Each structure stands twice: as structure tokens, then as C-alpha cells.
């Protein structure tokens, strides 16, 4: 509702990251439908970046792809940099039901925007269902374990995670995000000090889900703070 009120002020384009970066939160599809419908009535085009959607517990509950059949003011973007760990491929794609918008994009498309290596690798990655299943099992299983263990530590508030990282708010007086970062880096563990993000200054850290043994090492460090 707050976002809709903001959009009343003459905007014509809305970009969302869902699941969100840096919070790892997500907007559910039914709420997205209401938002996109509102934007349609205000002639606002909506672009949703779903780079992290494969990490969501229930992808179908989060993705806006089915909504491209209902709304012409919507485009959904996806890529292979996160879930498929291939940022160097620079490969992504968009889904929209707006043929006019798509035609205009093709007019502006640069020649050879997708090379043969990217096309070959992309097809292999997106059709590798075994990798998809195993990666989700590992990341989602470890994310659930980390959330459960971290909720036992009163010094942190754990936010629900829909991406491959977890956001923590530090609740121990005198302990800063820089302190937590330093404690982790001394043990060879890289986490993100979120002080550079707007509204997350000094009180928030986040970390990506790693292999089980590294996640356990991180838990051990956080328990000692």
C-alpha cells in the first residue's frame, strides 16, 4: 500500500528485485498481481528482476512469470549469474506478453548480443534438471539449518530468506557490523558488512549459504561474539 501511494506521484516505470537484494525478502505472487494491476491503471510499466528466484522455497508462489499472460505492462528478467554460478557468461533473458514492447527492444538490440558459447552453455545449464534439483536441496537445506541455529542466538534478529543469503540485524549493544565482519574474516570467512546499503548502516550483516562445513565454521564464530 505504501508503494502504491508513492507511485501516485507521476511515475511511469517501476523496477523490482524479487527476491530482493540485499534483504533476501520476497513479494508473493498474489501481492505482485495487485501491484501490477494498480500500475496498469496508472500506465506504469513494471520490470521484475528474478535473478534469485530459483532459491525461493516455493518458486511458483514468488515468480511473476505467469502474470505476463495477464498484464502487458510487465517484463520479468532472469539470468544465470547466481543460481548457475556463471556471472562471466553475461547471459540473461526476459519474458513479457507485450509484443509491441518486445519489438521495440529488438529494434535497439545490438548485433551479436548473444555469442555462440553463451547460447550453447545457456541451453546446457537451463536443461540440467539434476543440477537444479541438487543445488536447491543443498542451498535450501543449509539455509533452513542456519536460520534455525541463528534464531537461538539472542544477539541477532534473523530475517526470512528467499535468496541464497541471510540478512541479520545485530541486537547486542556495542557490537557493530564492522566487528562481526572482522571476527569472521580473521577465520577466513567472508561475509558482507551491510553498512554501505541505505537504511542498513552499522547494524546489519549478511552471508551467502556455503558448503555445510563452512556454514558450521561461521556458526561457531557467531556464537562466540
Located regions from the model:
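Structural motif
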Residues: 13-17, 47, 93-95
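PLP-dependent aminotransferase class I/II
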Residues: 73-159
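PLP-dependent enzyme catalytic core of the Aspartate aminotransferase-like
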Residues: 4, 30, 186-187, 196-225
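Active-site pre-lysine segment of PLP-dependent enzymes
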Residues: 1-10, 22-46, 50-84
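Short beta-strand-to-loop capping motifs
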Residues: 96, 168-172, 209-211
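Conserved PLP-binding catalytic core of the aspartate aminotransferase-like
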Residues: 139-140, 153-187
Amino acid at each position: 500500500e505504501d508503494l502504491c501511494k508513492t507511485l501516485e506521484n507521476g511515475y511511469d516505470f517501476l523496477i523490482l528485485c524479487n527476491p530482493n537484494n540485499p534483504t533476501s525478502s520476497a513479494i508473493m505472487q498474489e501481492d505482485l498481481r495487485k501491484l501490477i494491476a494498480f500500475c496498469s491503471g496508472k500506465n506504469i510499466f513494471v520490470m521484475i528482476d528474478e535473478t534469485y528466484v530459483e532459491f525461493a522455497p516455493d518458486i511458483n508462489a514468488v515468480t511473476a512469470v505467469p502474470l505476463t499472460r495477464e498484464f502487458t505492462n510487465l517484463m520479468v528478467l532472469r539470468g544465470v549469474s547466481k543460481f548457475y554460478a556463471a556471472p562471466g557468461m553475461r547471459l540473461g533473458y526476459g519474458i513479457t506478453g507485450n509484443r509491441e514492447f518486445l519489438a521495440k527492444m529488438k529494434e535497439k538490440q545490438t548485433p551479436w548480443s548473444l555469442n555462440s558459447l553463451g547460447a550453447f552453455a545457456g541451453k546446457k545449464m537451463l536443461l540440467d534438471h539434476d543440477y537444479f534439483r541438487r543445488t536447491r536441496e543443498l542451498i535450501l537445506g543449509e539455509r533452513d539449518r542456519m536460520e534455525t541455529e541463528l534464531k537461538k542466538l539472542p544477539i541477532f534478529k534473523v530475517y526470512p530468506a528467499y535468496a541464497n543469503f541471510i540478512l541479520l540485524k545485530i541486537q547486542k549493544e556495542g557490537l557493530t557490523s564492522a566487528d562481526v565482519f572482522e571476527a569472521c574474516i580473521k577465520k577466513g570467512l567472508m561475509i558482507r558488512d551491510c553498512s554501505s546499503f541505505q537504511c542498513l548502516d552499522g547494524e546489519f550483516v549478511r552471508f551467502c549459504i556455503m558448503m555445510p562445513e563452512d556454514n558450521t565454521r561461521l556458526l561457531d564464530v557467531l556464537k562466540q561474539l
